Amino acid sequence: MWEAIISFFLTSVLSVFAKKTEFLDRPDSRKSHGRAVPPVGGVSIFLTLLIFERDNPFFLFSIPLFLLGLLDDLFDLSYRIKLAVTALVAVWFSTAVTIEVSIFGARIHPVFFVIWFVGMVNAFNVVDGLDGLLSGISLFSSLMIGERSLAFSIIGFLPWNLPDAKVFLGNSGSFLLGAYLSTASVVFFEGDLGYATLFLGFPFYEIVFSFVRRLVVKKNPFSPDEKHTHHVFSRKIGKWKTLLILVSFSLMFNLLGLSQKFYFIFLYVVLCCVLLFTYCVLQRGNGNLKL
């Protein structure tokens, strides 16, 4: 409980400091928000975890990516640099933690964990495009795998991040949450990337869909745009309804992963198809479908 109180207080203080120092996420052609917002939520969560979870290995492995995200917030780093550093952290984790990597029980080479980790951390970053979405997804995910301090740290930040957000997570926050929950999920599922993927099913769906969508229209798959699921949904039905719907889908994916039933992958595919169909209906509108 103290984590929530401290996180709330830190967010308040850091928000004031960010405004005075002009450390703000300003609107531009790549972003959907219409005003400058302090991107210090990740910093407040990090400092809270530093107090309560400094010996937690998942937190320790997340520190380099938190710093990477903070530098990205400050200097807008190249995606190549971010991919390289994320891959190095994945290699570090895979060599430091003695678990056998598998997919639904079938053992695989550890290099697949590196690929999976890089993709998942970037998936969390992609999902952080709607007020409260990544925070809500991460809150339920952390609760379900017993990461209590992380959950309470998010709870303290969440009131600042709900629509219309007064404070953003920033890339420092999305990278921190992505690294922490990816590593924690893999260990929770004893190295099984299949069940970890089901558990973190919404970020995984969004990164795969975004990648394929851009390739179909012959665009750089790493280039940002405003055609993600949360962007299209929020433009048509509003931020709050979108937030409730997508967090609910993420919660269902969490439960599918926790079940550890192989055949639940079919339910996952069905739910993804529902998301995709709804996306196409909303995106089509009165004209042609635009990916």
Curated annotation (Swiss-Prot):
Site for Important in orienting the substrate, residues: 72-73
Q: What class of enzyme is it?
A: transferase
* Domain of life the protein comes from: Bacteria
Q: Which PANTHER family match?
A: PHOSPHO-N-ACETYLMURAMOYL-PENTAPEPTIDE-TRANSFERASE, UNDECAPRENYL-PHOSPHATE ALPHA-N-ACETYLGLUCOSAMINYL 1-PHOSPHATE TRANSFERASE
The record lists the lineage as: Bacteria, Thermotogati, Thermotogota, Thermotogae, Thermotogales
Origin species, per record, is Thermotoga maritima (strain ATCC 43589 / DSM 3109 / JCM 10099 / NBRC 100826 / MSB8)
Provide the temperature dependence entry. Optimum temperature is 65 degrees Celsius. At 30 degrees Celsius activity is only 7% of the optimal value and at 80 degrees Celsius, the enzyme is totally inactive.
Question: Which pathway?
Answer: Cell wall biogenesis; cell wall polysaccharide biosynthesis
**Activity profile over pH:** Optimum pH is 8.
Tell me a GO biological process for this protein. capsule polysaccharide biosynthetic process
Q: Which reaction does it catalyse?
A: di-trans,octa-cis-undecaprenyl phosphate + UDP-N-acetyl-alpha-D-glucosamine = N-acetyl-alpha-D-glucosaminyl-di-trans,octa-cis-undecaprenyl diphosphate + UMP
Q: Which keywords annotate this record? A: Cell membrane, Glycosyltransferase, Magnesium, Manganese, Membrane, Transferase, Transmembrane, Transmembrane helix
Indicate how activity is controlled.
Answer: Partially inhibited by magnesium at concentration higher than 10 mM and totally inhibited at concentration higher than 250 mM. Also inhibited by tunicamycin, NaCl and KCl.
Membrane topology label? Multi-pass membrane protein
User: Residues at site: Could be required for catalysis?
Assistant: 128, 131
Stretches that traverse the bilayer: 4-24, 32-52, 57-77, 84-104, 110-130, 138-160, 167-189, 194-216, 237-257, 262-282
Give the protein's biological function: Catalyzes the transfer of the GlcNAc-1-phosphate moiety from UDP-GlcNAc onto the carrier lipid undecaprenyl phosphate (C55-P), yielding GlcNAc-pyrophosphoryl-undecaprenyl (GlcNAc-PP-C55), the lipid intermediate involved in the synthesis of various bacterial cell envelope components. The enzyme is highly active when tested with C35-P, instead of its natural C55-P lipid substrate, suggesting that at least a 35-carbon chain is required for the lipid to be a substrate of WecA.
EC number from the UniProt entry: 2.7.8.33
What name is this protein filed under?
Answer: Undecaprenyl-phosphate alpha-N-acetylglucosaminyl 1-phosphate transferase
Q: Pull one GO CC term from this UniProt entry.
A: Gram-negative-bacterium-type cell wall
